[in-house]
A protein has these predicted regions:
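Long, contiguous, secondary-structure-rich segments that constitute the structural scaffold
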Residues: 514-516, 520-572, 638, 643-658, ...
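N-terminal leader/propeptide and maturation segments of large enzyme subunits in energy/redox metabolism
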Residues: 67, 257, 262-300, 383-399, ...
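Short beta-alpha connecting loops at secondary-structure transitions
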Residues: 236-243, 488, 492, 502-514, ...
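Glycine-rich phosphate/diphosphate-binding loops that line cofactor/substrate pockets in enzymes
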Residues: 76-96, 153-161, 184, 283, ...
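Flexible, glycine/charged-enriched surface loops at secondary-structure junctions
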Residues: 92-95, 265-270, 317-323, 354-363, ...
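N-terminal export/assembly segments and adjacent metallocofactor-ligating motifs
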Residues: 1-262, 299, 404, 443, ...
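Extended redox/cofactor-interaction regions of prokaryotic respiratory oxidoreductases
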Residues: 110-230, 249-253, 344-479, 488-496, ...
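Flexible glycine/proline-enriched surface loops and loop-helix/loop-strand junctions
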Residues: 163, 234-237, 287-291, 325-330, ...
């Protein structure tokens, strides 16, 4: 059975073969455009999750003694329906909220948004994609009028002379994608911007800028790092820029300054295909490389070198092409949208977007991070990437759903605000008085581990009148629930996903789900029936997709020319899948967007002026170091799946904190010691690992674990004012050696 990996947005092709062994299927890679026969460790071991030792196989209800106990589906769903009716009767429709996930199929994401807006009629629905792609989406929509992570096939990168990769560690998070960088590396054109010398940064063949930087004294006033003298080395395969955390925007402003000041911009392209260039000149003029160096720590000559390298690769200067790509490292910031906008401004100045062989793109992370934000589980959207406050969009979708447009709620709270507002803590007696949702339905998300300021989120979840979680395993969030509903996962279900390239692909069922596991489509249909909704909720994924296609017709993300049958036929004929928009059954799809015009009313891309503000929680005397969070190769997102795979868990079984050896000596934190990290949100502990891959003013922790080493317990929930994305990637921290047990008084 040909299908796709359950993890990241590469959606690597794989073949599943049923087996009588301990696992229900064997996994083999297949030749697909994104992975070309490769799989990472997570993909190779993905069958193990199908038979996780603690796989949920029956509904669970919280009993009077406080324990979760097995229940029948009727009892569990009756409890959910009764709880919803009670909360809405007492506190209003918006007192019930829904939280979705970027791993849900397109069909599930669509049905979840439809359920929230037609059955619950609540405005309060959002999803964990707000933690992943919101800033990139906001920037792309503002500039291009459309948001498709990569508006070109990933394979196009191979022909470029330069790729600027900001805040993405592809070599660990998406290993099969690295093969697409082989060509640009051979030409010395890979530029990686990352405060760490990550596995991806190491592909450039150079150490970065961190050598020689000043190490802050614990308890003293912080100082900006001093860059290494001179331009520093340039690797044989590219350049690694290692800025101060939270200053990626300064790097981009300086690069654009050089492009403008040295006459390297594509003037004809700017005149013919863009607007706003004059508005951008003023803020960019203030960021000459020497000034930028004092803030971002990257030597001025290296900034000039990279700007000239990108310009030389651009078509206007006779190059084979260049790409500017952003990832979570620069987007998960209180100025994430501004940083993405600066990256787009740079790409537009060089004449890259809308040209074959060049462009701007965002590296989508979650498996259906693209499709998951297109069809209705986002707080401000309707299917087809329509705006929920657009009267024409509301009328179109309402006709498909068979409801009055006036009954569709307006925009709801974005994820951080929604999670911050949960629980019966207000002083008023109605939802209108205190504004706090009292019930939450969670699908495909583990917010206890993945949300910022997670201790506060956990406390808010505990304060709910009703928490319902649909999950595969007893995740940390599921363990807090009043009702837990076991659901199907990737190899047990039919559906579609949309990859980081906007390629719509089929997910196929290879095995039956164990026990009493059900699909979310069935669960939503049963709840709609119990709640007395006249709106139809089909349970056949192919039928749901056909409805999604009708609802998306005419939207930015138009799937109306697609069906399960067409996707199956395309694959059977050796096709690679179809990229949206696909507005008709005979439309070939659009692998490359914007070649003729951008999706704005006048067809021109917008350059938007932005400027650097800095992190919301910057270093200070009592927290003189930067804390940066990220991922490791062996784990995925909150770790709820990968921590249950022995082959992966054995390699990285616990959280750790990386720090520079010089910093470790200064702080008295040895390699292998337990380190204590304290921010304004709280304190955590983890094993210290010395490495010169991090800056001496920075510590790094992956976020895949719960408990005392769960780094999101101490990250800030400050959010980007445009996108609502939280600032996971930088906050101020104090680091000390944790006292050994025998050292604790008493």
């Amino acid at each position: 059975m040909d299908t796709h990996c359950p993890y990241c947005a590469l959606q690597c092709g794989m073949t599943l073969t049923p087996t009588a062994g301990p696992l229900p299927v064997t996994v083999a890679p297949r030749d697909f455009p994104t992975n070309r026969g490769g799989l990472c460790q997570k993909g190779w071991t993905s069958a193990t999750v199908l038979r996780a030792a603690d796989r949920l196989t029956t509904p669970l209800l919280r009993a009077a003694d406080g324990e979760l106990r097995p229940a029948t589906w009727d009892d569990a769903l009756d409890a959910v329906a009764a709880g919803i009716e009670r909360v809405q009767a007492e506190h209003g429709r918006d007192a019930v909220a829904v939280f979705g996930g970027g791993g849900l199929t397109n069909e599930k994401a669509y049905a979840l948004g439809k359920f929230a807006r037609t059955v619950l009629r609540t405005a309060n629905i959002d999803y964990n994609g707000r933690f992943c792609m919101a800033s990139a989406a906001a920037g792309a929509n503002r500039a291009f009028g459309a948001d498709r992570g990569l508006p070109f096939p990933l394979a196009d990168l191979a022909g470029a002379d330069a790729v600027l990769l900001l805040g993405s560690n592809l070599a660990e998070t998406m290993p099969p994608s690295v093969q697409h960088l082989a060509g640009v590396r051979s030409r010395g054109g890979l530029v990686v911007v990352d405060p760490r010398r990550s596995a991806t940064a190491a592909l450039t063949g150079e150490p970065g800028d961190a050598v020689g930087q000043r190490v802050p004294d614990a308890g003293r006033s912080p100082r900006r790092p001093v860059p290494a003298p001179g331009a520093g080395p340039v690797g044989d395969q590219g350049v690694h820029l290692q800025p101060v955390p939270g200053t990626d925007l300064v790097v981009l402003l300086a690069l654009l300054h050089v492009v403008v000041a040295e006459g390297l911009a594509d003037a004809a392209y700017l005149a013919e295909r863009t607007t706003g260039v004059e508005d951008v000149r003023r803020p960019v003029a203030a960021w000459w490389p020497e000034r930028a160096e004092t803030v971002c720590g990257v030597p001025a000559e290296r900034l000039r070198h990279v700007a000239r390298l990108l310009a030389a690769a651009s078509p206007v200067h006779g190059g084979a092409g260049a790409y500017v790509l952003t990832g979570r490292g620069v987007e998960q910031s209180s100025q994430g949208t501004a940083t993405v906008t600066a990256a787009i401004n740079l790409a537009l100045a060089l004449g890259l977007p809308g040209r074959a062989g060049s462009g701007y793109g965002a590296v989508t992370g979650q498996g259906n991070g693209q499709g998951g934000r297109e069809h209705g589980q986002k707080a401000d959207q309707l299917p087809g990437y329509r705006k929920i406050d657009d009267p024409a969009a509301r009328a179109h979708v309402a006709a498909v759903w068979g409801v009055d447009p006036a009954t569709i709620p307006g925009p709801g709270k974005p994820a951080v605000e929604l999670l911050r507002s949960l629980g019966a803590r207000g002083t008023g007696t109605t939802f209108a008085d205190d504004g706090r949702p009292r019930a939450l339905l969670v699908h495909g998300s583990n917010v206890v581990v993945s949300a910022p300021d997670a201790d506060r989120v956990t406390a808010n979840l505990r304060a709910l009148d009703l928490l319902v979680v649909c999950d595969l395993v007893p995740s940390e969030t599921a363990l807090l629930a009043d009702v837990v509903l076991p659901v199907t996962q990737w190899a047990e279900e039919e559906g579609t996903m949309t990859s980081l390239e906007g390629r719509v692909i089929r997910r196929r069922r290879a095995v039956d789900a164990p026990g009493e596991v059900r699909s979310e489509l069935w669960i939503l249909a049963e709840l709609a029936r119990r709640l007395g909704s006249p709106v139809a909720f089909p349970t056949d994924p192919a039928v749901v997709f056909d409805e999604l296609a009708r609802a998306s017709a005419g939207g930015v993300a138009d799937y109306s020319g697609l069906s399960h049958g067409r996707l199956d036929a395309d694959e059977a004929a050796g096709g690679p899948g179809l990229h949206w928009p696909v507005p008709a059954a005979d439309h070939p799809g659009a692998p490359r967007l914007f070649l003729d015009r951008f999706a704005t009313p006048d067809g021109r891309a917008r350059l938007v002026p932005v400027d650097h503000v800095g992190p919301s929680d910057d270093v200070r005397p009592d927290a003189p170091l930067y804390l940066v969070t990220g991922r490791v190769l062996q784990h995925y997102q909150s770790g709820a799946q990968t921590r249950r795979v022995p082959e992966l868990d054995r390699v990285v079984p616990e959280p750790f904190v990386e720090l520079h050896p010089v910093l470790g000596l200064r702080l008295g934190v040895g390699d292998g010691d337990r380190a204590r990290l304290t921010t304004r949100r709280g304190t955590i502990e983890a094993v210290a690992r010395w490495t010169d891959a991090v800056r001496p003013d920075t510590v790094f922790m992956p976020f895949h674990w719960s408990g005392e080493g769960s780094v999101n317990r101490v990250t800030t929930d400050a959010a980007d004012p445009v996108s609502g994305m939280p600032e996971f990637k930088v906050c101020a921290v104090d680091v000390r050696r944790a006292p050994a047990l025998q050292e604790v008084p008493g």
